[in-house]
């Protein structure tokens, strides 16, 4: 699965796509594995692998974009948080930690926090007790020093996620797009449009400044309607990609992986029709 993810990432990035991976499923360092290595190397080497793939696949100097995330409950989350502190490491990816309410409560109360793997198991194979406050302070320090990791308040995201009511149909949110604007399920894609709030201010920088809410509401409706058309346009482009793959000179064995990848993306786009209409320029109002 780890190698398949890398291959799919490369295939997407060669078409100028960005990718978000959640690494919570990877065994923590030292865990037993059923191969000649005997134990797992943990998260960090795979962070490097995906980062290197991102830097290597470029078009005219423009490389792909990558988001790597992990749950704070994962025993290797501290190593994940520290991974970019060494200069030159994981330079091809943004990294973000998925923070739970339980962890934040432990931070506030200065209590120990139990990490485990698998993170959602009632019978984990690995457990580890840590100081929640110390790890939180490390997150804050590293973000101050190197601008990463980002923080995803995951329980809040899931509580406010409408698509997760269809989690049993394949729409369970697992990570975000590379810039973190929209949490998504596997093989879905981000389609984003922002409304400039400053443009709705009437008589700006005066005592009579006010926000044109009626115009904003009208444009929000139009924006959502436009984004619905964008989904159809995207599926047309995916059809073109699928047609090109069919006519590529490589043998079917080579082409099949990319072809099936785009089939999965098209299916998810058609079923979910996800859009991201947001706002910008709030600070300029």
Where are the model-predicted features located?
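Internal transmembrane alpha-helices of multipass membrane proteins
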Residues: 245-248, 254
């Amino acid at each position: 699965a780890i190698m398949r993810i890398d291959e799919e990432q490369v295939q997407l990035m060669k078409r100028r796509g960005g990718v978000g991976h959640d690494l919570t499923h990877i065994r923590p360092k030292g865990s037993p594995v059923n191969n000649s290595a005997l134990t797992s190397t943990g998260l960090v080497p795979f962070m490097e692998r995906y980062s290197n793939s991102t830097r290597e696949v470029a078009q005219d100097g423009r490389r792909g974009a990558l988001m790597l995330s992990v749950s704070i409950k994962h025993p290797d989350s501290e190593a994940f948080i520290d991974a970019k502190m060494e200069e030159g490491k994981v330079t091809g990816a943004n990294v973000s930690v998925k923070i739970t309410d339980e962890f934040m409560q432990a931070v506030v109360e200065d209590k120990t926090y139990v990490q485990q793997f698998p993170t959602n198991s009632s019978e984990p194979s690995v457990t580890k007790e840590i100081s929640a406050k110390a790890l939180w302070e490390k997150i804050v320090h590293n973000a101050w020093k190197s601008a990463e990791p980002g923080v995803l308040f995951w329980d809040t995201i899931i509580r406010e996620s409408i698509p997760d009511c269809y989690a049993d149909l394949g729409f369970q949110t697992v990570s975000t797009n590379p810039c973190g604007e929209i949490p998504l399920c596997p093989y879905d894609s981000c389609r984003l449009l922002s409304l400039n709030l400053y443009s709705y201010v009437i008589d700006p920088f005066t005592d009579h400044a006010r926000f044109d809410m009626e115009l904003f509401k009208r444009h929000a409706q139009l924006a959502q309607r436009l984004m619905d058309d964008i989904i159809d346009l995207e599926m047309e482009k995916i059809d073109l990609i699928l047609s090109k793959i069919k006519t590529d000179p490589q043998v079917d064995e080579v082409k099949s992986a990319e072809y099936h990848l785009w089939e999965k993306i098209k299916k998810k786009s058609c079923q979910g029709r996800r859009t991201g209409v947001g706002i910008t320029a709030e600070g300029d109002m």
